[in-house]
Amino acid sequence: MARYRGPRLRIVRRLGELAGLTRKVPKRSYPPGQHGQARKKRSEYALRLEEKQKLRFNYGVSERQLVRYVRKARRVSGSTGQTLLQLLEMRLDNTVFRLGMAPTIPAARQLVNHGHILVNGRNVSIPSYQCRPGDVITVRDNERSRRLVETNLQNPGLANLPSHLELDKSTLTGRVTGIVERQWVALEVNELLVVEYYSRKV
């Protein structure tokens, strides 16, 4: 399944707030569609599917990518759900977003794809690059790149900088100081339901 490129507010109405996907707030609080306002009890499968979709749409990953992350998380000792969230949170596009250098994850992905972002002084144009403690994230030294990021920093997508990141606005430099902790994940999601969803599929 390819990355979603359709109307973002429809997704937010169906799944709830997704800070990584869009900053816009839907006018209607109920899900889209003819029967959006009807309340009916959802099955356990539907609940698991919804939590999985939250991850997919918030982080902008394809179904195939998410399956790979689940497999990778299972190979690590500890909580599979928390490891899965850490893998998604430590992606370069999400890190650029959490630093405030882009208003959304799709916008951060575009900055990375277009070569505006450097990691440890090298051009990294792969949004899925896994950031590690010690990585230094800077903006390419040209006027257009700096102007883009400076504008975004004036109105970041999320107000609070997570504890594993540092930002020097004067030099447009971000540092990864550790691995993200669960309480800093800016998404209301039950990761255990996501793991359960994939338990028979992966």
UniProtKB/Swiss-Prot annotation:
UniProt keyword DNA repair, yes or no: no
GO process terms (BP): ribosomal small subunit biogenesis; translation
InterPro entries linked: Ribosomal_uS4, Ribosomal_uS4_bac-type, Ribosomal_uS4_CS, Ribosomal_uS4_N, S4_RNA-bd, S4_RNA-bd_sf
Keywords: Ribonucleoprotein, Ribosomal protein, RNA-binding, rRNA-binding
PROSITE patterns named among the record's database cross-references: RIBOSOMAL_S4, S4
A single Gene Ontology CC term: small ribosomal subunit
Source taxon at top rank: Bacteria
Domain S4 RNA-binding: 90-152
Family (UniProt): Belongs to the universal ribosomal protein uS4 family.
Protein name: Small ribosomal subunit protein uS4
Native source species: Thermosynechococcus vestitus (strain NIES-2133 / IAM M-273 / BP-1)
